Every structure is written in structure tokens, then in C-alpha cells.
Amino acid sequence: MHYKKYAELLKNGTYFSHIHSPTLLYPKGKVMYAQYGNSPLQGLNSQVTNLNLIRKVVAASAEMDSFKKLPNLQNNKLPLNNLKARLNTKAIYISNEEAQLTVSKIGTPNAIETDVPGTIKNAPSNTLLTHRSFKFFVNKIYAKPLISLKKTKETKPLLLGKTGTTLTQKGLNPFQSLFLNTKSSSPSTARSFGTKNIVNTLQIKKIVHKFENSYSKLTEINLITINLASANRIRQWAEKTLPNGKVVGEVINPETIHYKTLKPIKGGLFCERIFGPLKDHECACGKKFNIKNYLTKTVNNSSIQPIAESRQTQPNTQLSLNLQKRYFCRICDVEYTYSIIRRTQLGYIQLASPTTHVWFVKGIPSYISILLDMKKKHLQGITYNTETLTLENSFRGRQLLPVSPSSIFESWQKIMKKQYPEKYNLTNTMIKIKSTNTLPLRVSQPNSNTSYSYMPNIYIPEGEGEEKTKTKLKKTTPLNAIAQKGVKYKKPKTKKALYKQYLKNYYARKPKNSNQAEAVSFGVNKVQLPLTAFQQRNKVYFYKSEKRNWPVLTTVAKMQYIVSKKGWFKLIQYVIKSAESYGAATPTKMDGLQKMSLLTKQA
């Protein structure tokens, strides 16, 4: 249909059958629709739920805003005495009069009658192809939706887009495009106005005044943290300031109720001023809520409601806090409210000194005990005042802590020896040195570069039984490395640094012109030699030269470890002049010192 012919028919109030949207049409694209409840104010969003549109064209002039150019209507009546007041109204009133729609001005929204369902049938005309019947509600408010449309030419209402192409060519309904232009993210609902006619079904977008249950950016939770409340935050939760200036919330009395009246004591653990009334809307004086005996105060309430949608802001992005009045008694300062708030209302006790939190004392791990380096048992005793700790004793534990690396290593040695005795206390380990050479073995002074020298071709068997392996020692290897090699079964260079700094204190010095046994010690770490070496006759033979012409065979009668003051171990070897060289039998059931004295006397 040409737009000029459409404009002429529109002025005459002709109904168009190709318009599939049941609406009340103003020229220039203004649509009226039914609204349940009071009409919205100008400037707010006028879209509401349960819309009831009427399929009828109310024709008027294209210049509807100008009351000077108002032509006569053919099918409808506009009984308006004051056209200026008509144009300034925010809604129109529709009633059913003789199968025609009559538009009249409404007074107040409160004067609306109840809903009465009715039916309107459109009589056939030259341009109407079929009979269309639909239901509507009489005596309802039909408000103008606030749809911002650009002004179009008078002869082309709602048919041309910005490019000049008709909306019908694009497959769009021009009246349906009005609702598509409305900005709303709410789900749409469909309402049918006829049971048999499917054409009368229109999808209308619904406004939700509450937060949606579906996903939205506003209700998205990115992070949840759980912290301990600080003292100021606890005081903020528990305190409340009355209109007369009193601050209530601190528990200052340890008592609960009075033994005679059985009422809560003021400022106690059951105080009504702090936690709330015992009975609903009744103070401690026994007075019930009355407008004459209360104090009011406006405080922030936790209820949050969304602000209505507006065209300038995005929907559901602003929140408004409702202000609620709270009423208090003038005499006893008890709030007039429900007694159930005693379950949630907080109070606080002001402590003279800070105390520990049970999570950090009894928790696993106990962070305070780790920080103070105390046992949890002693920490709980101090926390619950069953034990005392003075400053003098508190710093005593610090003196026992190792400071230097050597002391740390020594303490570690002791701990590992107790924890793993089978690893650090070797058993059935024997050292046997054989040699056929008669080169002398000398003990040098501690200040010399070479500590010990020994005869070549010395073999040290390692292990037991068939697993014994012999290690040939080089001539340049010092004797202390031999001892370490035999004890630890490791290369001497790897662990040499462990005992090097203490080695000079353990050298044995032989007195001149003395026939007593020599005590030769080596700085050896970790491993203890067994004491069964002498009992099993596993002897270590050394050849020592003297001023005589023949060598004297000496034996190591006893080998043992002695713990020094600094935590290191000494390998003490008692070198005894053997009586075997003179043909005498060596006693076997005596300890090392007895043998030493006996052999010394024999010599």
C-alpha cells in the first residue's frame, strides 16, 4: 500500500487488516496499552507486566499535539471539553459504549472500577477482510509508553526507516518495531487476546523489579575471603547509638538475671537494651508500643532494592538503601521490635589486655607456638593462666639455640645419632692392616705439613665374608685418612674437611725415653668402631723402630670413640709393646688399660 493512501485511510480512522499488532494507535507512532495499577509518572519507565492491548485504530489528525487542528472523527468520539487538559493528561480512559470505543479523560487513578471482561467485535468494512473479535477489560487505564522515536514526515508514519526503505519490505511489523526498540533485558512473556485467533498473540517484554535468578554481572562473586574481625569491627557491629545520645552494646556486668524478679540485669549478659526485648514490641518497663512513648531514629537497613529502570542508566546497576525507623522507649531505652532479634544481636566485652585466638593456639599447626618456639602444652598453660613466664626465662631458650654453623652441625649430629642409631652406629666393622715391610712408622709434630706416614702396600679389607674388598692405600695418603677410610668406607678427600680443623688437637706425643703406651687419636666423624676388636683377636699391627737393631711389634689393644666437648668423636688407639716379640702370651681377658700396665711392667 502506498504511504499516501495509508495516510488518508489513517485520517479517516480505517482499520488495516495487515497490521497484526492489536494496538490503539495515535498518529506519529504513539501507542496506548493497558496497564494494571496506577499509571507511572513521566520520566520513569512505563512498561509493566500483564499488558492488555486492544486491536482498534483510534484515528485523529497527524498533528495530534496541536489541539487547533483537530478534525471530526468518523468512528470514534472524543468528548473532551478542555483539549489542552486532554493533551496534558498522562492516561486516557476507555469504556465500552455501543460496540464503540470512547476515549475520555480520567480523574485520579484511585477512582478506577473493578475489571469487567467484555468483548468488542469489529464490523466489516471495505478494507476489513475478516471479522476479528478479542477480549479486553473495561474501565482500565491505557497509558502512553515512553518510546523515543524521531519525528517522521506526516505522510509516512512508521513505514519508512532511516534509509527510506519500508519496514514491511524488510519483513518487520512497523508496530512490533516499537516494542523492539525498547531497552530491556528482562525475559518476554506472551499474552493472547483471543482463543482461536493466533494473530492476536503479541510478545511483550516484562520488567522484573527484583534481581534475576539467572547469571548477571551484578550478582557475580569473584572472591570470598574469611578474616578475623578486628576490635573496631566488633564494636561497630555491637554498638548502637540511641536518639538521646546514649551508646549501648557493651556488657559491663557479668550477672544474668535478678534472683527475685527473674528479669535481665541492666548491662548484663541478658540485657534487653543490648540484645533486644523479651516480648515482641514491649520494653523493659512493661509498656507496649505506642506512638506517644517512643523515640525515633532513622538508621540504615540492610534491605537492598533495585532502582527503577531509566533511559539514562543501565538496568539493575544501581542500588538504593531503604531507611527504616527504629523506636526506643524513653525510660528504659529498650527498642520496640521483635524478640527474635536476640538471636542475632551482638554485644561485646571490653578486655583489659588483648588475648589470643583459639584458632592460632589450638589449631594444627599452632602458629603462635611455632613463632615463639614453645610447646603447645606450655603455650596453652600461659594462655589459660595456669603457668607463668617471666622475661628472664623467656630469653633463656635463645641461649640454647645454635648460633654458629659448627654448633648447628653438632646439634644435628646428636639428633641424627638418636634418631637413626643403626645408620650412624656401625657394628661388626673391622680394620686389619697387614704388612711385610719393616719401614718405620713415625708420629710427627702437629705443626708439620705431613701428619703421619706409613708403610706402603697396606690393604684395608671392607665388608664381611665373601663381600670383603681390599683397598690398596697409596704412600702419600696420611694415616688419619686411613682411619677414616676404614671406618666410613668412603674416599678420604670427600670428608676430610669435617675434621681437618680439629685434627691438630688430637695428635699424640710420645714422651722421650718412655716405654709407656702411646695414645694416638684421630678426628673421625659419625661412626663408632666396635669394642669387640680386641676380644676377637682382630689386631692391627704396626712396626715401630727404636734405637735397637731389631723392630718391635706393637698392637692396637683397644679402639673406641670418646665424645669430645664439641660433639666430635675421638678414635683412641692404645699402642702397646707386645710380648709376642719376646715369646710371651698376651692376656685376652683384660681391658686395654690393664693390658697396658701389665705389658709395660713386662717390658
From Swiss-Prot:
<dbReference type="GO" id="GO:0003899">
    <property type="term" value="F:DNA-directed RNA polymerase activity"/>
</dbReference>
<dbReference type="GO" id="GO:0046872">
    <property type="term" value="F:metal ion binding"/>
</dbReference>
<keyword id="KW-0934">Plastid</keyword>
<protein>
    <recommendedName>
        <fullName>DNA-directed RNA polymerase subunit beta' N-terminal section</fullName>
        <ecNumber>2.7.7.6</ecNumber>
    </recommendedName>
</protein>
<dbReference type="InterPro" id="IPR015700">
    <property type="entry name" value="RPC1"/>
</dbReference>
<dbReference type="InterPro" id="IPR007080">
    <property type="entry name" value="RNA_pol_Rpb1_1"/>
</dbReference>
<dbReference type="GO" id="GO:0009507">
    <property type="term" value="C:chloroplast"/>
</dbReference>
<comment type="similarity">
    <text>Belongs to the RNA polymerase beta' chain family. RpoC1 subfamily.</text>
</comment>
<dbReference type="Pfam" id="PF04997">
    <property type="entry name" value="RNA_pol_Rpb1_1"/>
</dbReference>
<dbReference type="GO" id="GO:0005739">
    <property type="term" value="C:mitochondrion"/>
</dbReference>
<keyword id="KW-0479">Metal-binding</keyword>
<dbReference type="InterPro" id="IPR044893">
    <property type="entry name" value="RNA_pol_Rpb1_clamp_domain"/>
</dbReference>
<dbReference type="GO" id="GO:0000428">
    <property type="term" value="C:DNA-directed RNA polymerase complex"/>
</dbReference>
<keyword id="KW-0862">Zinc</keyword>
<feature type="binding site">
    <location>
        <position position="332"/>
    </location>
    <ligand>
        <name>Zn(2+)</name>
    </ligand>
</feature>
<feature type="binding site">
    <location>
        <position position="283"/>
    </location>
    <ligand>
        <name>Zn(2+)</name>
    </ligand>
</feature>
<feature type="binding site">
    <location>
        <position position="285"/>
    </location>
    <ligand>
        <name>Zn(2+)</name>
    </ligand>
</feature>
<keyword id="KW-0804">Transcription</keyword>
<keyword id="KW-0150">Chloroplast</keyword>
<comment type="function">
    <text>DNA-dependent RNA polymerase catalyzes the transcription of DNA into RNA using the four ribonucleoside triphosphates as substrates.</text>
</comment>
<keyword id="KW-0808">Transferase</keyword>
<comment type="subunit">
    <text>In plastids the minimal PEP RNA polymerase catalytic core is composed of four subunits: alpha, beta, beta', and beta''. When a (nuclear-encoded) sigma factor is associated with the core the holoenzyme is formed, which can initiate transcription.</text>
</comment>
<dbReference type="GO" id="GO:0003677">
    <property type="term" value="F:DNA binding"/>
</dbReference>
<feature type="binding site">
    <location>
        <position position="329"/>
    </location>
    <ligand>
        <name>Zn(2+)</name>
    </ligand>
</feature>
<dbReference type="GO" id="GO:0006351">
    <property type="term" value="P:DNA-templated transcription"/>
</dbReference>
<keyword id="KW-0548">Nucleotidyltransferase</keyword>
<keyword id="KW-0240">DNA-directed RNA polymerase</keyword>
